[in-house]
Amino acid sequence: DNTIVIFMSDNGGLSSEPGWRDGEIHTQNYPLNSGKGSAYEGGVREPMIVRWPGVVKPGSKCDKYLIIEDFYPTILEMAGIKGYKTVQPIDGVSFMPLLKGTGDPSVGRSLFWNCPNIWGNDGPGIGPTCSVRNGDWKLIYYYETGKKELFNITEDIGEHNDVARQHPDIVKRLSGELGTYLRKVDGQRPSFKATGKPVPWPDEIY
């Protein structure tokens, strides 16, 4: 009873064989769109199970979001380790409040992904992309084309309804937030073969 069990994974289900990402056979991540390597939820979203006797209520559920960087500070807090020092700043935040039901660290928080390289086979959401999630909204920016997609994840978890044209203000806000973050962390981005110049940041195209 003094053991904490955490079950999770690092990405969506693998479906990289030709035809698996965009055909009827692609169902293992339902209702999420696409799979591993995709910027869509099917590539970045995973369920998690935590067993912690006396802390996590058995059978309870939580629909809040977090990211893998959050596990480091959370596990240290679980172990009761305080006042520790790290070589670099910690990117994650502890999700202990979610486990205890005392708060929600995702409120007002943005999560970022940057995949500037070509990965595996083609398919929905596959290719050099960067994206940001804030609250209900998720913005995906395609480096190769400059295209942006906006989804309300709460209402459209399958990401089938791109509402970027209906909400240009949200697209602009999230593009700015994403571009600012990528510059801050010196994020990589592709370059044009013809000129060797880097493609625009998401907030340089509207």
Question: Across the structure, where does each feature detected by a protein language model lie?
Answer:
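Short, flexible loop/turn segments with low-complexity composition
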Residues: 7, 88-89, 186-198
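Active-site-proximal N-terminal segment of extracellular/periplasmic enzymes that hydrolyze or transfer
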Residues: 18, 161-169
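Catalytic cores of eukaryotic secretory-pathway lumenal/extracellular enzymes that build
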Residues: 45-46
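Short acidic capping loops at alpha-helix termini that bridge into adjacent secondary structure
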Residues: 1-3
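C-terminal cap/loop subdomain of S1 sulfatases and analogous C-terminal strand-loop tails that border
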Residues: 13-39, 56-60, 64, 69-153, ...
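Intrinsically disordered, low-complexity polar regions and short flexible loop motifs
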Residues: 156
